[in-house]
Design a protein with these regions (language model features):
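Noncatalytic, helix-rich "gating/capping" subdomain that lines the substrate-entry/channel surface
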Residues: 1, 7-57
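Single conserved hydrophobic/aromatic residue that forms the stacking wall/gate
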Residues: 1-6, 10, 292-301
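Secondary-structure capping and boundary motifs in well-ordered enzyme cores
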Residues: 32, 59-62, 131, 165, ...
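Contiguous, non-catalytic segments that form substrate-binding/exosite surfaces or channel walls
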Residues: 34-184
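An N-terminal structural lobe/cap that precedes and organizes the functional/catalytic core
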Residues: 84, 139-142, 168, 188, ...
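Active-site recognition of the HExxH zinc-binding catalytic motif
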Residues: 187-200, 221-225
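Post-HExxH zinc-binding segment in Zn-dependent metallohydrolases
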Residues: 213-251
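Long, amphipathic alpha-helical stalk/connector segments used for oligomerization, subunit docking
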Residues: 236-291, 295, 299
């Protein structure tokens, strides 16, 4: 081990850590978990399209029970939420998250109330019909604009946008297009593009190793939300490309850059986290954590 360099030690330690945890899970129970994950994904999509939560509810219940079971195998005696948190944000604990969210909520509640009490802009123009094919063209424009390389990736369509990578040279972005909400696909493209650019810039020497993967979801999400909010909601970001956006999406020709800029920064209450504005987005996360805390300490729902 004395001859290992930093990156090699990272790979070794990460593999050992994951292997020790995974070995504690009975194979047959893990197989049940994987099958239910696949079935749950299909049920969620069916429920979403039918607007019927009852289709997904039993699968959600099973997944919660199985997730708690897996956490009990990997870290027995530890709070379930802390076990899961450590998978996505290594070394983080719920006490730190609670403190952070408490400060955030204290500052955000009066701010949101003040904003919502003000006169709201008219967003009628943004609910006209926007051809999904035109939205795809705008998406491709924006991905190219922010630096996503199609030579090292691809773009597809799914019910829920996400980014998937198999190496730094094969990074796949997905999106969803709503006929009466063009901004959704635009900002999903910018957000997922941020994730993808992170992956495309990983040193190829570290592809498919722990040194080339991000063990801190906060780091990865900081990149996607930097592109989405710090860049994408800045008026200067759109000045070089807005006329091209209008060319690709004819309905946008009746919407000035100032109107567009106001709409992409419009603060409103919403039910969907991924569609939330920059200000209210945090409440979706805080609410989910609150739902965990108001139930049994080790429950997930």
């Amino acid at each position: 081990s004395a001859s290992l360099v930093g990156s090699e030690m990272c790979i070794r330690d990460s593999m050992q850590r994951d292997m020790e945890k995974d070995r504690r899970i009975p194979k047959d129970r893990y197989e049940v978990m994987v099958r239910e994950q696949a079935e749950s994904g299909n049920a969620w999509e069916d429920a979403k399209n039918a607007s019927d939560f009852s289709i997904f509810a039993p699968h959600l219940e099973k997944m919660i029970a199985l997730t708690k079971e897996m956490a009990g195998y990997t870290d027995p005696g530890k709070e379930v939420y802390d076990v899961l948190l450590d998978k996505y944000e290594e070394g983080m604990d719920s006490a730190t998250i609670d403190r952070l969210f408490g400060e955030l909520k204290e500052a955000l509640i009066p701010l949101v109330k003040k904003i919502l009490a003000a006169k709201q802009p008219d967003d009628t123009k943004f609910h006209a019909y926007f051809d999904p094919d035109d939205q795809r063209k705008v998406q491709d424009l924006l991905l190219s604009y922010i630096g996503f390389s199609k030579d090292a990736g691809a773009v597809g369509e799914t019910e829920h946008p996400f980014t998937l990578n198999f190496s730094s040279k094969d990074v796949r972005v997905t999106n969803h297009y709503y006929e009466h909400d063009p901004i959704s696909a635009m900002f999903s493209a910018i957000h997922e593009g941020g994730h993808a650019i992170f992956e495309q810039n990983v040193n190829p020497e570290y592809d498919n190793t722990a040194a080339g993967s991000c063990r801190y979801m906060g780091v990865h999400e900081s990149q996607s939300r930097f592109y989405e909010n710090i860049l994408g909601r800045n008026k200067n970001f759109w000045i070089p490309v807005y006329e091209k956006v209008q060319e690709l999406m004819p309905q946008m020709k009746d919407i000035s850059l100032d109107e567009f800029y106001r709409e992409i920064n419009h603060v409103r209450n919403s039910l969907i986290r991924t569609e939330a504005d920059e200000v209210t987005y945090c409440f979706h996360i805080i609410l989910r954590l609150s739902l965990i805390h108001i139930s049994e300490p080790t429950r997930l729902a």
